[in-house]
Regions:
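Hydrophobic alpha-helical segments
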Residues: 1-335
Length: 336
């Protein structure tokens, strides 16, 4: 075998090896990039769901006030709140297109389609019944609570399907915090009734109150176990050490101490509603902080994936070019 043929054979073997290695590395890098892009969509979707849940929680509170007063109060506030809710629904539906839904797992697809096609579609029907006082307060509250629960469950599924452990954990923390905040919203309604009556009207409502406290505690504990330290610190600084949280705690202690003593819960229900709403608004600030942190983190993951892909591509092209240049140069030198 001549020197020329040996050089050509060696070059072909080297090129084949480089092409093969580059193909596998580029495929892996491209796969990582696609995962990062898919994860980015999931994170953005989670933040949009959180914003919608926040507005639905406020609409649930306004609806409870409207129905509880027999339609005499909160009418204007309820109509204004519905507009804010509708705005967030449109934002979610715009982002949640068919192509994206089809890329989700079967379980997530089923839940999203159920929420969008059933829950949100039924919202308009429930509103009509509320306006005409054709639905009970309990049924209306249960509808909103079920809808919120389904929406939060969808965020939990996105966390479950995430292939990035760090982001999956923070999404899980995000989910648990959303659950805790939703339970705080229900507590707001329950104690509003108790304070309006200056006692718990029955043991069922008191049991509901105790259960809500236990659920909030459990969700906050799960949140604390999964959340990064910076998020926990922000939560403690923003919510735990705040004035509204201290006041809410005092109201809760009073309700637990004398639940059935007539006149013992001598608290202005409007004052209670205002204070716990302040606490819930502070909790929403934590949600926004987590969302911002998640989006910042996913941008880093995406940038790293892009850099890896571009790096592999550049190294592959340079390696191929070097082999070709060396081979051609060797053939020329031999030819001379």
């Amino acid at each position: 075998v001549s020197f020329k043929h040996r050089i050509i054979l060696l070059s072909l073997v080297s090129l084949f090896s480089i092409f093969t290695l580059s193909y596998f590395l580029l495929t892996e890098a491209q796969h990582s990039l696609k995962n990062a892009e898919s994860l980015e969509k999931s994170v953005i979707l989670s933040t949009k769901i959180s914003e919608l849940v926040h507005e639905l929680q406020k609409e649930r509170g306004r609806t409870a006030g409207f129905l509880g007063s027999g339609g005499k109060t909160f009418k204007k506030e309820l109509q204004e709140q519905r507009k804010l809710t509708d705005l967030k629904i449109k934002e979610l539906e715009k982002y949640l297109n068919k192509e994206y839904v089809s890329s989700l797992s079967g379980e997530a697809q089923k839940l999203f389609l159920s929420v969008i096609l059933n829950g949100l579609d039924n919202l308009s029907q429930v509103r009509v019944k509320v306006d005409s006082l054709q639905i009970s307060l309990e049924d209306a509250i249960n509808f909103y609570t079920k809808l919120n629960s389904d929406l939060i469950d969808s965020v939990a599924l996105l966390a479950k399907n995430s292939k990035n452990a760090e982001i999956a954990n923070e999404l899980l923390a995000y989910t648990n915090f959303m659950y805790a905040k939703d339970k705080a919203g229900l507590e707001r309604a329950v104690l509003s009734v108790a304070f309006a009556n200056k006692m718990f009207p029955d043991s069922k409502l008191f049991t509901k109150f105790v259960d809500l406290l236990a659920q909030q505690k459990a969700f906050i504990k799960s949140f604390s176990l999964a959340a990064p330290e910076r998020v926990i610190d922000f939560y403690k600084k923003t919510v735990v050490s705040s004035g509204p949280s201290e006041q809410v705690l005092n109201y809760e202690r009073l309700a637990l101490t004398s639940p059935f003593t007539e006149g013992a819960l001598n608290v202005d229900p409007n004052q209670w509603f205002r204070i716990i709403t302040q606490k819930i608004d502070l909790m929403h600030k934590v949600e926004l902080f987590i969302a911002k942190d998640l989006i910042g983190k996913i941008k880093e993951v995406k940038l790293e994936a892009k850099s890896r892909f571009n790096g592999v591509l550049v190294v592959s092209v340079v390696a191929i070019a070097v082999i070709l240049i060396v081979s051609i140069a060797s053939l020329r030198v031999r030819g001379e």
